[in-house]
């Protein structure tokens, strides 16, 4: 006669197996996310999702895992740190001639690594419970990952809308819920270059640099171009300014180590990449999905924001006529360069960026 399943023991084993597979934290939650539905609907109604139509298309199913995968009783949420050693946050940000890539994208595409580990975790569980089914998701299904992570006890949602942990800050990929500990702090809201955090816990994606440089397929609105600075793929500012990230832990995963070609590279060199070279360098990287055209679009904006230099102007002019979308950003960037040359302008860093660099150098010296 088979013994009844000890769910408490199984939960402990799942967390142990997850740790053995390289996850820093493993939590288990139920599927009831109904409390998040009104906020999700209000966010969609305000069009804060921009061009990310899939968010509206799936509607409230994002808050109903049991409808997405009928029969689902529990969701396992995991945390994996991705902060690399020698992240060079400040060094890259304060040199406008270098390209800043969000630190999660410097190494191997996290989707693949995490999905493989989650699959192994699911298979381990099936060895103990053959009748159970599982499906691993890593940004691949329309579910609300952050509310699940909260319910699973991985942390709380900060005012920048990311999950925070007392022990690890927010530089990680997503039992009993954890109390919110942001208090009166609004550092992430005030540091955002484009004012994308429109109210606590609410991000207007249409203003977010990560959205503008990664998700947006068309032209970057002119009002945001000067504010993007040298950020050519994503932005980490709201995380870098967060006091909790003083406790962020370095990753143990070699796959998340920065690729040399993407770590603080000169903008002029990046802008010269052919599509074939772009595809070669970004193979297995999250960056590849935006394609060569949007990559060049982002770099053109950064070159426009860089100090006057004849080399910047020549680089921009060399790619005229390749594509209408790129031309729009090249012409804007050339105009910015000529304006600086004609005014003999001295490069002035934006106050928010200067403040951020000081905070990183003081509070995160190992990553500066």
What are the functions of these language-model segments?
Residues 296-307, 328-337:
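Structural detector for internal amphipathic alpha-helices that build alpha-solenoid repeat scaffolds
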Residues 277-281, 308-320, 340-350:
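Amphipathic alpha-helical scaffolding segments comprising HEAT/armadillo-like alpha-solenoid repeats
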Residues 260-293, 300:
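Alpha-helical adaptor scaffolds
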Residues 185, 209-223, 257-272:
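Short microdomains enriched in Cys/His and/or Lys/Arg
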Residues 1-179, 345-368:
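Auxiliary alpha/beta "docking" domains used to position bulky ligands
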Residues 23, 187-211, 217, 231-255:
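Iron-sulfur cluster-binding cysteine motifs and their immediate structural context
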Residues 289-294, 323-328:
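Alpha-helix N-cap/helix-start positions at coil->helix boundaries
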Residues 159-160, 164-205:
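Loop-centered beta-sheet repeat module
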């Amino acid at each position: 006669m088979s013994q009844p399943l000890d769910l408490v023991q199984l939960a402990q084993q799942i967390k142990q197996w997850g740790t053995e597979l390289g996850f820093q934290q493993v939590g288990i939650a139920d599927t009831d996310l109904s409390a998040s539905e009104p906020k999700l609907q209000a966010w969609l109604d305000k069009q804060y999702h921009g061009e990310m139509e899939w968010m509206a298309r799936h509607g409230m199913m994002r808050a109903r895992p049991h409808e997405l995968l009928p029969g689902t009783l529990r969701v396992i949420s995991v945390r994996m740190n991705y902060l690399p050693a020698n992240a060079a946050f400040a060094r890259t940000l304060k040199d406008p001639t270098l390209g800043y890539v969000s630190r999660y994208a410097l190494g191997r595409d996290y989707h693949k690594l995490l999905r493989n580990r989650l699959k192994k975790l699911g298979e381990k569980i099936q060895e103990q419970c053959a009748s159970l089914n599982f499906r691993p998701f890593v940004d691949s299904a329309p579910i609300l990952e952050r509310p699940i992570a909260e319910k699973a006890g991985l942390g709380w949602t900060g005012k920048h809308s990311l999950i925070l942990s007392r022990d690890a800050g927010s530089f990680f990929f997503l039992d009993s819920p954890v109390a919110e500990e942001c208090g009166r702090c609004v550092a992430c809201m005030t540091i955002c270059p484009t004012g994308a955090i429109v109210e606590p816990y609410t991000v207007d994606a249409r203003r977010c640099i990560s959205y503008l440089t990664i998700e947006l397929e068309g032209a970057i609105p002119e009002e945001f171009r000067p504010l993007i600075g040298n950020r050519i793929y994503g932005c980490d500012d709201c995380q870098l300014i967060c006091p909790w990230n003083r406790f962020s832990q370095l990753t143990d995963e070699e796959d998340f180590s920065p690729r040399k070609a993407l770590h603080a590279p000169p903008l002029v060199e990046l802008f010269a990449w052919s599509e074939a070279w772009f595809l070669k360098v970004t193979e297995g990287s999250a960056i590849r999905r935006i394609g060569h055209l949007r990559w060049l679009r982002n770099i053109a904006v950064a070159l426009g924001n860089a100090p006057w230099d004849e080399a910047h102007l020549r680089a921009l002019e060399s790619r005229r006529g390749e594509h209408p979308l790129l031309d729009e950003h090249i012409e804007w960037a050339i105009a910015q360069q000529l304006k600086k040359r004609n005014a003999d302008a001295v490069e002035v860093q934006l106050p928010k960026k200067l403040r951020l660099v000081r905070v990183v150098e003081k509070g995160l010296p190992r990553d500066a």
